[in-house]
Amino acid sequence: MYKTIVIDPPWKKSTGGVGHATLQASTHYPVQTVGEVVSTISDWFSRYPVAPESHLYMWTINSFTAGKDQGILAAMNVCDHLGFKPITLIPWVKSNVGSPTPYGMRYTEMCIFAVRYRKGHGIRTRYSGNSDIESVPNGKGLCSSKDFILADRRQHSRKPEEFYKFVESRSRGPYLDLYSRTTRPGWKGVGNESGKWKA
């Protein structure tokens, strides 16, 4: 069973305003509404079982006002539907180029870190060389690693290798990458464009 899952959904965004990037995204790959994202992931979970205690990293769009089918709140709702509790946001700071928005240049992209665990327990991340992902009482699993990724932007929507190193340093496998486009050693990639790139 997979203990760490990365999901980079092809969010459907509205045109114009904060969601102007939608037209750009839809020219690269088919996009999905929140309902379609939940349905697709649920189907994959039935084929690739996820452990009862596991970590989830879900990429989202940096917006609270972009509509019900996009943005941070929509992604948090997807986490809830899948049985994961959102814990924190992990920013990817793009060190080479930003994206223009009505509110200024955007140099970040957000990933939600969420967990699934037994009632009354939490799941700690790797720290101090400890590779356990076992349940520990709430508040006992402290992690001293940084909470952001600093890396260059590459092809449209392609996430940096630094992110996957970050995940592997905090969470243990088996690893599942949904809506994957990159073949990566030690990971199971699933998606229509899986294998498009190599790590």
Go through each PLM region and give its residues.
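Class I S-adenosyl-L-methionine-dependent methyltransferase catalytic core
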Residues: 1-199
